[in-house]
């Protein structure tokens, strides 16, 4: 079996299992253990952080996929990875102090209609930074033709982690 067929099959299995676990999480575990208020809070935190994530990663995950095959020397490929990590890191190093300095103004402006989310602003920022770096490393795994592990981390691991946290939270 070829590498593409094998990885596609394994990715299909992991996505199917992740879908089932996600359905159990959404239909049973969230309402049972968190209630509708906290279920909405978790979904809102993830959605807002997913909106911020592209500004932090600045599209470097797409640049890795686009330009990796253009480089032939190992030093050039390593330089691409270094640059794709440094760009989000520089953005984070600029953005976090500005966010910290204007924290209360940002909270008032962004969360003027719903102040209950404002106390989770740091959580939103942390999730956005984490997902930005995850996307860069996931794209690196894809160009190295190791999509099964990256797909496992992207699809199955978060759902398993949420299920365990919800079960042990109760």
Where are these regions (language model features)?
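Interhelical loop/hinge segments that connect adjacent transmembrane helices in multipass membrane
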Residues: 1-4, 116
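Transmembrane alpha-helix boundary/hinge residues in polytopic small-molecule transporters
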Residues: 24, 63, 133-137
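Signature of the first transmembrane helix
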Residues: 3-62, 100, 127
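Short, proline-centered helix/strand-breaking motifs
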Residues: 27, 47, 66, 155-160
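Alpha-helical transmembrane segments and their helix-entry boundary regions
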Residues: 7, 11, 39, 80, ...
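Transmembrane-helix boundary and interhelical linker motifs in polytopic inner-membrane proteins
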Residues: 2, 30, 34-36, 52-86, ...
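Alpha-helical transmembrane segments of multi-pass membrane proteins
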Residues: 6, 10, 14, 48-49, ...
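Hydrophobic transmembrane helix module of multi-pass membrane transport proteins
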Residues: 17, 86-170
């Amino acid at each position: 079996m070829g590498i593409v067929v094998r990885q596609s099959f394994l990715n299909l299995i992991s996505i199917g299992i992740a879908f089932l676990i996600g359905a159990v999480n959404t239909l049973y575990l969230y309402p049972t253990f968190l209630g509708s208020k906290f279920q909405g809070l978790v979904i809102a935190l993830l959605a807002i952080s997913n909106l911020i994530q592209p500004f932090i990663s600045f599209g470097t995950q797409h640049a890795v996929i686009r330009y990796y095959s253009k480089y032939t020397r190992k030093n050039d490929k390593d330089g691409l990875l270094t640059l794709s990590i440094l760009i989000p890191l520089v953005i984070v190093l600029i953005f976090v102090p500005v966010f910290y300095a204007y924290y209360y103004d940002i909270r008032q402006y962004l969360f003027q209609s719903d102040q209950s989310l404002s106390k989770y602003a740091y959580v939103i920022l942390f999730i956005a930074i984490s997902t930005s770096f995850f996307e860069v490393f996931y794209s690196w795994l894809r160009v190295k033709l190791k999509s099964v592990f990256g797909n496992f981390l992207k699809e199955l691991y978060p759902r398993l982690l949420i299920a365990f946290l919800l079960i042990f939270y109760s």
